Every structure is written in structure tokens, then in C-alpha cells.
Amino acid sequence: MAMVTGGWGGPGGDTNGVDKAGGYPRAAEDDSASPPGAASDAEPGDEERPGLQVDCVVCGDKSSGKHYGVFTCEGCKSFFKRSIRRNLSYTCRSNRDCQIDQHHRNQCQYCRLKKCFRVGMRKEAVQRGRIPHSLPGAVAASSGSPPGSALAAVASGGDLFPGQPVSELIAQLLRAEPYPAAAGRFGAGGGAAGAVLGIDNVCELAARLLFSTVEWARHAPFFPELPVADQVALLRLSWSELFVLNAAQAALPLHTAPLLAAAGLHAAPMAAERAVAFMDQVRAFQEQVDKLGRLQVDSAEYGCLKAIALFTPDACGLSDPAHVESLQEKAQVALTEYVRAQYPSQPQRFGRLLLRLPALRAVPASLISQLFFMRLVGKTPIETLIRDMLLSGSTFNWPYGSGQ
């Protein structure tokens, strides 16, 4: 049996949202009585050949044709269509591995929808949201427009391209962004494009980026509803990855010399071996920022990547790691569908984006603290500041101020 609520379902397996309404489970709807003569969603040319018995790949009942990419019965076709069109999410009452066959298909809607996605039913093929084979040109970097300008309408609730609304999750992530306005301000603060920032500018912009990181998280979808202890745990674990993503998104003009000066290395020389290791880490940081820049990641993709990094179920002390994992999966599904729709000529793009996340973890949080915040906070742990920023909200005062 499964609870049901409005939300984002997704094709990544266990991607159905957790019921936040806390309501009682609805009686499972029996789709076996779906009228065979109902409006057909079968794909042209995919009907069964006469005399050929094909079973539904979801429940094993006799299929009525190919629906949304695979052969299914009328019941599973109708269930999938209803789930997608109504934007339903389900919750499994068992272990998310319920048996789905002709006799048990109505007992757990969560596992039934999960199996629909697993066998290849395509969410985008549901007629209301069918994605055309050719789409307008990609936004932001691909179109040559200024970063974020093509997404301004989305951030205010508009569509990214005619007839193809961006998912509500991405729209909310964009509304939570302190960019693109902040990105322009950071760039302007450093003078002409490509100019080398001084030590004070590096520290000031780093403070703004960290403050913006926490502000983004505070307004990100689902995050405010989590227990405060969970919010702190998630940010303490992911802040360094979010910082690197924000540095790349803001196109922060970083160069080695001011970074080393900001870290205080000129004033306190270190042993040769340690200096070499430190320089390797500095180069690793700059390399990650550069790679994100070369990928020309747009604002929607940055929002999804940051949500995936933020909702890490491995954080210590979480009250419900499975729920956090489901939120991470929602962001991953949103990124999958967005990239598939927006960049159809780049089939490897999603994989390349996702591979950036484990690479970001190779940049130690201690390195970022020493590079950017040593002059600002001394030996105070950044994690302590993040907790204070999260709990204080916009009333938190940096030495440099977040609004300068």
C-alpha cells in the first residue's frame, strides 16, 4: 500500500517524493478496468502484430500495445499517465521492493511507478508534456546570451521555451538563486574582465559567495522544511562543494598569487613538501572551476547540481537519511530531463555534469578555508560560521558585509 500526494515523480527508480501531507493512504485505484476503447496513447506503428501475444512489461498482463515507449496493458498505461499528468508522488509502506504483477499491481503505487520507470516508460512521452524532437537553441552559454538572461523568465515563473515549461523544481531552484545579479556584481567588483584581484577583494568576494551559498540553501525547495539540525548537518558537509560551484557560476577571476597571499603563505612559509602539496590542491581548486567554465553550465544546471550536492544522505546525524536521498534523486531527475530537453544534441552532457560532483569533493574544505577565510576569521571553523549564518539568516554580519 502506498500513500499518495502531489509532487515530482521521476524516472530514476526510487525518485518518488515522500508524502509531506501526512495524510492517510488512499485506497489503491484498480486500473484493470480501464476501458480498452479509451483514447489511445499507443505510439504509431508500435501496435502488436496480429497473432503475437505480448505481455505487459510492468505487471505481466496482456498488453494492448506500446505505450510511452514499452508494451503495457491498459491498466499500467492509465496508471502511468495519471501519475505523470497529476504530478503524483507515492510512498511505499514496505521496503520499496514490492512485487508488481497482475495480482499485486494495485497494492503499492510507489513500487508500481518505480517499475514503470525502470522498464523504460518515458515521462516526457505523456501527451500533455510530450517533448518535440527539435527544440529551440540552448540557453545561456550555448546561445551566446549573457549568463542567466535566457532564464530570467523561468526564475519568475515563465517558460524556458514556448510550450515546454521547466519543471517546478528547477523554477524554484532558480528563484532561490542570488544570481545572475550577484554574478555581475562580483565581476564588476574586480574591475575589468580578467583582472587580477587583490588580497582584500579575494577575501571580500569569498565572504559574499559563502553568505550567498547559505542564503541559497535557506530558500531552496524542501530545505526549509527539514529539521534545523538536519539543515546544519547538510550544509556542514556540502558547503565546500557549493562554494566551488558558486565560484564557477559567478566567474570569480582567481589567480594563484593573491590566493596564496590571502592564505598567509608569504607571511608564514611552510616546509617544501607541504608547500608542494598545498600548491597541488590550489591547482585542483582552480581546475574544477575552469572545467565547469568550459562546460558552459547554465543557471538551471547549476541549481540542480547544487541541490544534488546539498541533499547528501551521508551527512552525519540526519533524522531521516532516506528522505534526504529522495530529495537528492528529485534534483537528479530534474537535471536529467532538463538536459535531455534543452541540449538534445549533447547526449553526454548529463554524464559530464554529474561527474563534476565527485571531482569537487577532491578539493578539501580545509584548503578553501585557508585560501579564502584565514584573514577573515582566523582559526574559527567555517562550519561554525555556516551554522551561525543559517540560524541568524539575513541578520548575520560579516566583517566585509554581504551587501557591499
From Swiss-Prot:
Gene Ontology biological-process annotations = cell differentiation; detection of temperature stimulus involved in sensory perception of pain; entrainment of circadian clock by photoperiod; negative regulation of transcription by RNA polymerase II; nervous system development; neuron development
Biased composition annotated in UniProt, kind: Low complexity? 33-42
Q: Where are the zinc fingers (NR C4-type)?
A: 56-76, 92-116
**Pfam families per the UniProt record, alphabetical:** Hormone_recep, zf-C4
Q: In which tissues is it expressed?
A: Expressed in heart, placenta, liver, skeletal muscle, kidney and pancreas.
Please give the residue ranges the record annotates as the region Disordered: 1-49
Which SMART domains does the protein's record reference? HOLI, ZnF_C4
Gene Ontology cellular component terms for the protein in this record? chromatin; mitochondrion; nucleoplasm; nucleus
Induction or repression: Inhibited by gonadotropin in granulosa cells.
Family listed: Belongs to the nuclear hormone receptor family. NR2 subfamily.
Its protein name is Nuclear receptor subfamily 2 group F member 6
Species lineage: Eukaryota, Metazoa, Chordata, Craniata, Vertebrata
Instruction: Supply the gene name.
Output: NR2F6
